[in-house]
Amino acid sequence: MEINIKKALIASAASLSALFCSAQQDLMVSQQIFSRINVNPAGTGNNKGCDAFLLGRIQWAEVDNSPKTGLLNFTAYSENVKSSFGATVNYDNLGVGNSQTNAQAVYAYHIDLNPKYILSLGISAGFNVGSFDPYKNTLKDDSEIGKSTYVKDKTTEISPDFNAGAEISSEHWMAGFSCTHFLNDTSTTFRKGRHFYVYGRGFFNITHNFDLAPLFSYMHKHNTNTTEIGCQAFFKKMIWGGVAWKPDFNRFSEMQMMSITAGFEWANRFRFGYSYDMNFGKYNNLPSNTHELMLSAHF
C-alpha cells in the first residue's frame, strides 16, 4: 500500500515532536533495557567477557521515507581494574533528507558498595555527524526553491559529543540516571540537544520457572517529557515477552505508542528479540508497522 508524501511528512513531523526515532532527539527503541550504553555509559553490566548488541528499527514501514534506525553497542568488563570499556555507534535517518550518525567510546568504573549493591559511574566521548540532503527531500511547495531559507546543497556538520551517567544495581533491581549531549543547550538540524534520563527495572522470581521484570523510564528534553511503563515475563530465563506504554505527557493527545516484545536466549550466549509498535493518539491513522529486531551475543 502506498501512502502519499503528505502523510510521509506528517509522520516525520510527529516523530520530531514525539521523541520516537527523531534525528534531533535520541534513539527511542523498545528493547533498550538489554543494552543501555548509548543513553547511559554507566549501564555496562559487570559480567566477565564481552557483549555485542545490534539493533535495527523501521518506523511506519508503509510510509514513504519513514524513519530508520541502526544501533551497535559493544562492552567488555575487567574485574582486575573494576572497569568496563566499550563503544557505541548509532545511525538515525529521519527520512526527509536528514540523518545523524553518532559514535562514542565508553568507560565505566564499578564500585562495590557492599556485597549486594554495585555502583557504576560512566562517561563517553566521541562525535556526531549531522547531514541534510535536499535531493532526498520532496518539497510540498516548489516556490521554496530560491528562498534564502532553502538549502540547495548537501550539508554536513561534525561536532564533539559527550554523555555521562550513573547506575546502581543489585540481584533484583537496578536504577540509573544520565545526561546525553551535555555540551548542547538546544537541538539543531545537525545535532541533538541535551537529554536527561531516569530509569529503573526490577527482576522478581514468581515461581521456579517464571520471573517478572517491571520497568520504567523517563526522558526530559526541553518541552518533551516521555515516559515508558512496562513489564516483561521470563520463562526459565530463556524466553520472554512483554508490553510497554510510551506516551509524551506534553503531547499526550497527539502521539503515544504501545510496544509488544518477544524474544529468546540460546546457550546463555545469544539473544534474539523482536518488537512491534502500535500508534495511538492524534496520529493513530498512520500504519502500526513499526518493527524492531535485536541480536546480541556474550563471549
What are these regions (language model features)?
Residues 24-299:
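Subset of outer-membrane beta-barrel
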Residues 2-12:
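Bacterial N-terminal signal peptides that target proteins for export
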